[in-house]
Amino acid sequence: MDRVADRLSALGSTAALELRGVTRMFGALAALTDITITVRPGERRAVLGSNGAGKTTLFNCVTGDFLPTSGTIRFFGEDVTAFPPYERIRRGLRRTYQISALFLGLTVRDNVYLACRGVSRARFSMLRPSVSDALMQSTERLIEAVHLTSVRDQLVSELAHGQQRQLEIALALAGAPRFILFDEPAAGLSPTERRELVEILTALPPHIGYIIIEHDMDVALRVVESVTMMHNGRIFKEGAPHEIESDPEVQELYLGGGHE
């Protein structure tokens, strides 16, 4: 843990992501109530809880798909509470989704190349050979980072489910993100695929922080340094993975039948 603390300290003191008193109402229903979270640059955190705890609504507020009813959201010190999603993407925020959004009729390489091109600041200079070469180099590097080099010329529709999830991570890494939201990346994966997912996430560049929502608690606790537990739209517990795993109240809520 000392090495983790040293790494986080070296990345700066300004919070990567800071939520203060975030509440989200749907009519009379409070999906989120007074959520306050601070995530440091390079920090890897899990947000866990049963279905209906508010995890996905939290992600939607961070990405700008939902605007908070009250409270503020800051990204690397900048107030982005009212920013649309594309402005947050421009500032280095990325997200994966529970449901894949891939081009099934294109190859792995084409999917990653298009993602790199879409977030490239030089996207209007594609005819310049230097720009095209740089994008292709980025494409190959990302494919290698998610262990898909051997299938880079295959159609995405031909990939195994686990490989498609790996491809989604590559797309999220396009354009040098500063922070990523992973929405259940282990969903539907076999034990072997989950082990590979853990390898990919733990090997991400140290400056990239992330929050992971995950129903597989074993996977989540292996790839993070801190955990936030949610229940009924509120923060229930926070702590290190070993503290959360051994907490009696968490065991009762999450492992004793409150988790699907």
Predicted stretch roles:
Residues 2-260:
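Glycine-rich phosphate-binding loops of nucleotide-dependent enzymes
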